[in-house]
From Swiss-Prot:
This is Peptide transporter PTR_C. SUPFAM superfamilies: MFS general substrate transporter. The keyword Hydrolase does not apply. Disruption phenotype: Leads to a marked reduction in the transport capabilities of di/tripeptides. Results in increased resistance toward the peptide-nucleoside drug nikkomycin Z as well as the glucosamine-6-phosphate synthase inhibitor, L-norvalyl-N3-(4-methoxyfumaroyl)-L-2,3-diaminopropionoic acid (Nva-FMDP).
Length: 569
């Protein structure tokens, strides 16, 4: 009797399988993979892709970044006024370096903050690991903010404030370099390393859970936290305007303690990738050998067994993939030069307009608010909609990021033209006889579209760049390759320093126009050079699954934002 039952069950199961095969054979000519299985080649081409849930450990890392960015943007946003004006000017300042001098020093600040990640990444990937490096550099960060706070007190002389400011900028820059190069790889490290798999939705639709989309969503979420933190500009600019600069710098100093607290609480929760054995030196040796022989096969142990190379064939493939990514980053300095206008020349332009009681540097919050609103929209609506028709690959996103950046500069040039057309000072705002410190008659709200366009360009170019740097780097070099991406911002700032002599009235229309043309051309050059990388994306990503790195990928997922907050409380 039991044998007959077993035979019936087997027969019924076979019937079900045949039924599924018949019902889906038109869409999927190959065999249908069961839920949880790795998709077939045909399914990879035809099924829609979705992301997995964001692991809980990512939230603690995100809190570290939120607190650090709260402090970074909160203290740096008042910098332009602090440097440009004196205590008797309107807007109020301290150092009195004028617009071109303040813009040059502002670009040095950005340059320094984005060249130091190279050092921070080297320390992490070679000696201390990401977690320990972040912890140590956070202490340096706090020391720098403390110096800035003390030397901005009203009792300090202008020379003392200038010396303290330069010292603080150097120390904070070292601190942010150690944090910035490691915190984004650390948050992505918390995502389990799993192959794509089949999932059946409640609607019955069969989809592919794609780990690369999960990484994409993690970086979108990461960037969301950055911009929530950057809303500190609202508080610090108000404190600067209504109290003084010392109050604006005291708030970031106090808030940074949250970053240290999140690091401490997550110490036993974070997945920490082991430090590689001189992995950066190995990668340079491998690359040098391949370049001198004009072929990466010359560095493969399997093809050169007599050489006894201290790496594997997979490592050679990973280094080659990373170099492709680094080539993509070479066009980014033009984009970062455009992006940098938001923190200096846009602020100066706002100071030439009627503010109606607002601080001239508060409008930077529009950029953050736009990103906070549009990241969830892009993640849940725009990107999935586009993926229904065509893969929306990284190179395509970055190209459109350049185009939106160029559009922002076009708008800024047109707006500056109308600022110069408005009285009473026309092309010498705030600085004509009889109208000293009187802005031209044009409303500051007209700057809003420029910040909006910059924000959309960030979602497309900046977030995708972070994702590209992480996914194309070898396992033990995530921080170093991330620092290569970040250092492009430093090169953009160096271009800004060279441009600063013309960043003054009445030349700003041509400054913005030149930036618009440069960004537009750079975007198209980028597209023609790298558009074929889109076709290699899946092949490069598959390299991560060729062998196990020892990480079992067991992390608790976040089911929803609400539940994750409850779990943390």
């Amino acid at each position: 009797m039991s044998q007959n039952v077993d035979e019936k069950v087997v027969h019924d199961d076979a019937s079900v399988i045949r039924s599924v095969d018949r019902s889906e054979s038109d869409s999927y000519p190959d065999s249908v993979s069961p839920e949880g299985a790795e998709p077939s080649e045909e399914e990879m081409k035809t099924l829609r892709r979705v992301a997995r849930r964001v692991p809980l450990a990512c939230w603690l890392v995100a809190i570290v970044e939120l607190a650090e960015r709260f402090s970074y943007y909160g203290l740096s946003t008042p910098f332009q006024n602090y440097m440009q004006y004196t205590k008797t000017d309107h807007p109020r300042g301290v150092l009195g370096l004028n617009q071109s001098g303040a813009t040059a020093l502002s670009y040095f600040w950005q340059f320094w903050c984005y060249v130091t990640p190279i050092f921070g990444a080297w320390v992490a990937d070679t000696y201390l690991g990401k977690y320990n490096t972040i912890s140590i550099f956070c202490v340096l960060y706090i020391i720098g903010i403390l110096i800035l706070f003390v030397t901005s007190l009203p009792s300090m002389s202008q020379n003392t404030s200038l010396g303290g400011f330069i010292t603080a900028v150097i120390v904070i820059g070292i601190g942010t370099g150690g944090v910035k190069s490691n915190v984004s790889p650390l948050i992505a490290d918390q995502v389990p390393k799993e192959k794509p798999s089949i999932k059946v939705l409640k609607s019955g639709e069969r989809v592919i859970e794609d780990p690369n989309l999960t990484i994409q969503n993690v970086f979108m979420f990461f960037y969301l936290m950055i911009n929530i933190g950057s809303l500190s500009v609202i508080a610090t600019t108000e404190l600067e305007s209504r109290v003084d600069f010392w109050a604006a710098y005291l708030l970031p100093l106090c808030f940074f303690v949250i970053a240290l607290l999140a690091l401490f609480l997550g110490k036993k929760v974070y997945h920490k990738v082991p430090v590689g054995d001189k992995v950066i030196a190995k990668s340079f040796k491998c690359s040098f050998l391949a370049l001198t022989k004009l072929n990466y096969d010359a560095a493969r142990p399997s093809l050169n067994p007599d050489k006894e190379f201290p790496w594997t064939d997979k490592f050679v493939d990973e280094v080659q993939r990373a170099l492709y990514a680094c080539k993509v980053f070479l066009i980014y300095p033009i984009y970062w030069l455009v992006y940098g206008q938001m923190t200096n020349n846009f602020v100066s332009s706002a100071g030439q307009m009627e503010l109606h009681g607002l601080p001239n540097d508060i409008l930077q919050a529009i950029d953050s608010i736009t990103i906070i609103i549009f990241i969830p929209i892009c993640e849940s609506i725009v990107y999935p909609f586009i993926r229904r028709f065509t893969p929306f690959r990284a190179i395509t996103k970055i190209f459109w990021g350049f185009m939106f950046g160029a559009a922002a500069m076009v708008y800024a040039a047109v707006l500056q033209h109308f600022i110069y057309k408005a009285g009473p000072c026309y092309d010498s705002p705030n600085d004509c006889p009889g109208f000293k410190n009187i802005p031209n008659h044009i409303h500051v709200a007209l700057q809003t579209p420029a910040y909006f366009l910059i924000a959309i360009s960030e979602i497309l170019a900046s977030i995708t760049g972070l994702e590209y740097a992480y996914t194309k780097a070898p396992v033990s070099m995530k921080s170093f390759i991330m620092s290569i991406f970040l250092v492009q911002n430093a090169f953009g700032s160096a271009l800004g320093i060279a441009l600063s002599p013309v960043s003054k009235d009445p030349k700003m229309v041509w400054t913005y126009t030149g930036l618009a043309v440069s960004c537009f051309i750079a975007g198209w050059v980028f597209w023609f050079l790298f558009k074929h990388y889109n076709d290699r994306e899946d092949k490069w990503n598959d390299l991560d699954y060729e062998q196990d790195d020892g990480y079992n990928g067991e992390l608790e997922p976040v089911v929803s934002l609400t539940r994750s907050f409850k779990d943390m409380s």
